[in-house]
Amino acid sequence: MALPRPVQYGKVQRMSYGKVKEVLDLPYLLEIQKKSFQWFLDEGLREVLREISPIKDYTENLLLEFVDYYFDGPPKYSEQECKERDATYARPLKVKVRLINKETGEIKEQDIYMGEFPIMTETGTFIINGAERVIVSQLIRSPGCYFASSIDKQGRKIFSGTIIPNRGAWLEFETDTSELLSVRLDRTRKVSLTTLLKAFGLYNQQLIFNKLGEDERLKASLEKEANKGEIGNPVENALLEIYRRLRPGEPPNVENAKNLLERMYFDPRGYDLAKVGRYKLNKKLSLWKRIFNKRAAEDIVDKRTGEILVKEGEIISREAALNIQDAGINEVLVYVEDDKVFKVVGNNTVKLDRYVDFDVSDLNIKELVYLPVLNEILSTTNDVNEIKQLIKERERELVPYCLTRDDVFAATSYFLGLKYGIGHIDDIDHLGNRRVRAVGELLQNQFRIGLARMERVIRERMTIQDIDSVTPQTLINIRPVTAAIKEFFGSSPLSQFMDQVNPLAALTNKRRLSALGPGGLSRDRAGFEVRDVHHSHYGRMCPIETPEGPNIGLITSLATYARVNEYGFLETPYRKVDKKEARVTDEVVYLTADEEDTYKIAQATEPVDEEGRFINQRITVRFGEDIIEVDKHEVDLVDISPKQIVSVSTSLIPFLENDDANRALMGSNMQRQAVPLLTTESPIIGTGVEYRAAVDSGVCVLAKKDGIVEKVSADEIVIQNHDGTKDVYHLLKFKRTNQGTCFNQRPIVRKGQEVKTGEVIADGPSTDHGELALGKNVLVAFMPWEGYNYEDAILISERLVKEDVYTSIHIEEYECEARDTKLGPEEITRDIPNIGEDAIKDLDERGIIRIGAEVKSGDILVGKVTPKGETELTAEERLLRAIFGEKARETRDTSLRVPHGEGGIVVDVKVFSRDKGDELPPGVNQLVRVYVAQKRKISVGDKMAGRHGNKGVISRILPVEDMPFLPDGTPVDIVLNPLGVPSRMNIGQILETHLGYAAKALGWKVATPVFDGAKEEDIEEALNLAGLSPNGKTILYDGRTGEPFDNEVTVGYMYMLKLVHLVDDKIHARSTGPYSLVTQQPLGGKAQFGGQRFGEMEVWALEAYGAAYTLQELLTVKSDDVTGRVKTYEAIVKGENIPEPGIPESFKVLVKELQSLCLDVKLLSEDNKEIELKESIDEDEQPQGLGAFERGLEEVENGEEDDDKEKFYEDLMDASQEQDESADDDIDE
């Protein structure tokens, strides 16, 4: 066996086991976001403005045109300032508007401010109101023409077809059981197909047969109509019939009916196929695909030259079919089974370059063009420049974005031909029929909605305002546009709060594809087929990375090499094969899913010699959805890389090929939840993707130019560039991410060091020398240990705690605002009533905690007082008021305190106040933000995981001296349960452990790329080289007794992650706290400082034991007997006996409810005396739980539900019982 070869990944050298020659580097991983947004700025905005202009008033006197747009100046604040100030990172958008008055010929031009437009940051995110957000790309059904088949009750095949636009009315073809053909307009009313054809001008049987051929189904429909015995003009009758169906109850007339049909399908304002819809429609309805391989039933003649292209009875080849289409022949007769003749009708489109003799590339028309319009243009002039000019002017007629009558006839012909096997039905889950709407397009649609609303306002104002004094500024109201944009960024389900636990989470979030959202599917209606892996996903969407839970398969991830083409379809790259020589070339082609289906594609790992020739004679290839074996000369393409089928997070799993897919899914998802640790360490066993993932995620600082490091400090690097300029790089120190993890950058260059462009000069969170480093390499042993690793629990050594191996920093943000209340303004102050000096020793003179102070739960962070309500003053108080002025007015303490179970060290304080000119929400005078950092060591109850879906909860931390140790005395760090491996079939973890053991001994870092990594013999060889046992097992000694264990144990180095599900965030206890308003029962949940629900089943358990008194107090004084719980509290404080419980509040609620249903309910005691139900005790008597008031306030601010909304809480949520990862991936956060 050959030794692995050294490969340089950034600054790190790894020994790579990869054998496949990489022709193409990984593309820039955030391209889908950046490119799409750039398209929107360059073209998308212009398209929308062009669509809407000109806006005319009803008399067509005034014209308002949008001429051009530009961004005026840089953003007001930097990205960092926006986050601190809760501002939006945006630039002002200005639009040049021209107002033309046709009567006077007067023209007014103005630049109109169209609001602040959010701008994408360098890393593909948006900052909206201070929060970093990501716009997820949406995967939706592409507009186009689709046909489907189903089997009816009699076992016959029935076909249906649909033309789906980007926006506008659908047109659906249906067959009923008696083979009558009908059309459904706009998903509502059915009319006969022949009625529609008549309305389109084929007004009698002869015309219909001439156009579509004689078909029994058409005859049957026509006969049925003939039986109705209509008189008059058939076209008008058809139009009126359609109008009656679509607008029942309105008096029909021909003019209205005509307009309605025009508006529905032929008017660009109401019907839009978009570029992609036109492309798909032409592709589907073009003639050549349907006549290819059929037998011609007549001589096919090129009308322009008189040349016979195909003789009658010949099979039409692919070449001939394409020539027929380009010759402008739109109807061809072919033989179908039993020598029947069928007429195939196309949609009259041709390639432009076959008709003009100049280069058409500069016209920017890639689609097929509509022949009648082209002929019209070519017949008017022979001058090349005039033709070009006319083509540019009539581009929307040549490539119409709405339907043409020819489209409808071609679709009808396709629909009729399906019965004879002409054409094929579509698979809607195929990626050739689903397209990606990325940021740019989603924004464009939103902008279009805003402009459409603005257009209505402008039209109204045009009629109202005085024509002479009107200017563009007075007509335009930008509110609808800014509101539409704000609404999209703020509340669209596709605009997500960025997942920022670690760099990988952020990167994946930006490369995500969602089938949910407006215009997409909904979770409940999505069936199994949509969610399933499809053969067309290969190299485009990852088959592994998707959430577990209700969103499985609906939210997916972009594959590593995939890219989105101009129509929004996903493409993936392949290497071309020279078929003559059976040699793989380095030429790369990108193919969409439907193009790929016609090629035979070999695997990237297919063995080739030095020159790239296939070694094997027979080669396994993919062909459509099948996997077949062919001769080596038949192979068309070869995969570009073995990792092209998976996403970035999946390609980070070494030995993925040895893991079960379900576990690999968990592994991919859990890597995104790894907490950035205090010190980072890249994996010994990597896959070679770590470097690109870290660099492209944008958390590392890269050098902009070649130069020499002049100065390095913790928070800035100065580089003197070779071209004489100087660059200063500012590093972010201890910033809080969206999820409360710590974002910290640190320099990895020295003074005087030479740096190259694009070199990593500073590491971010979870990176190590520019490589992604989510966890730590630790020594693991697979063996049971005293039952402490039962059910996937993990036993760890105290060394991991002492040496801060798995210590992470978490930063919480607390905010306090001083508002204006009805009784006067709140005040942030050190002077708090009834608080001892001890409690405010760490506050500065303003009443704000000093940086560096250590705080624990209940400590004051910001002192704040709120005016109390006025009461009747006594004479003495009035006297004091008169002497001392207002100061003696009552205030109460509403300071911001550290919540329960929190604490740490204050690392930052930000103060914003209206007096300093900061922008604050209305009614807020001052805003203080305090950042508190905690160092969290790993502890019992934390969740850890490897990269192979092997997760577990820490059950015990053992002293180092008790851990099992190796023969040389090294204690292991972690003991895992061997039973977690066989049934789960993630053998990758074992191979990683073995290879890690050898690599550690040899001092290597290893890269073992997915599907192209180290084999079993490679690992054995590495173990031999390191002088270790080739089976990877070692004798272990018990740390407590020093005796060896009976059997040899698998020991080695594994990369283990600490996940964000930390026990400190989950553990919770309450004695007294807030109660629900209506039922007076304690709230539930940690966020509400709630209690544990004692549910129905728990009550049964106590009943079974007959524990009557325990049950009674649980249901009364510990829950909702208001008077009883106050008295009980007093009794405990005074040391007396606990009194008799009273009547629970919820019982009173029940009685009231029955009374509200007009039932007179009375309570009687044993001796038939009526028991008075006392109303609930007054507000003053009600005990306020620990700071319940602030918590109530906080709930309202955090948008938690109010107390009075009855809630049902789950039973005690144990720290180990995860709300599993599916929730984290939920699309509407």
From Swiss-Prot:
Native source species: Caldicellulosiruptor saccharolyticus (strain ATCC 43494 / DSM 8903 / Tp8T 6331)
Gene responsible for this protein: rpoB
Reaction(s) this enzyme catalyzes, per UniProt: RNA(n) + a ribonucleoside 5'-triphosphate = RNA(n+1) + diphosphate
Keywords assigned: DNA-directed RNA polymerase, Nucleotidyltransferase, Transcription, Transferase
Descriptive protein name: DNA-directed RNA polymerase subunit beta
Database matches in InterPro entries: DNA-dir_RNA_pol_bsu_ext_1_sf, DNA-dir_RNA_pol_bsu_external_1, DNA-dir_RNA_pol_su2, DNA-dir_RNAP_su2_dom, DNA-dir_RNAP_su2_hyb_sf, RNA_pol_bsu_bac, RNA_pol_bsu_CS, RNA_pol_bsu_protrusion
Transferase found in the keyword field: yes
Acidic residues: bias regions: 1195-1204, 1211-1229
GO cellular component: DNA-directed RNA polymerase complex
UniProt-annotated stretches for the region Disordered: 1175-1229
Family in the record: Belongs to the RNA polymerase beta chain family.
Gene3D superfamilies reported for this sequence: 2.40.50.100, 2.40.50.150, 3.90.1100.10, DNA-directed RNA polymerase, beta subunit, external 1 domain (2.30.150.10), DNA-directed RNA polymerase, subunit 2, domain 6 (2.40.270.10), RNA polymerase alpha subunit dimerisation domain (3.90.1800.10), RNA polymerase Rpb2, domain 2 (3.90.1110.10)
EC number in record: 2.7.7.6
GO biological process: DNA-templated transcription
Subunit structure: The RNAP catalytic core consists of 2 alpha, 1 beta, 1 beta' and 1 omega subunit. When a sigma factor is associated with the core the holoenzyme is formed, which can initiate transcription.
One example GO MF annotation: DNA-directed RNA polymerase activity
Pfam families: RNA_pol_Rpb2_1, RNA_pol_Rpb2_2, RNA_pol_Rpb2_3, RNA_pol_Rpb2_45, RNA_pol_Rpb2_6, RNA_pol_Rpb2_7
Source domain of life: Bacteria
Function: DNA-dependent RNA polymerase catalyzes the transcription of DNA into RNA using the four ribonucleoside triphosphates as substrates.
Coiled coil as UniProt keyword: no
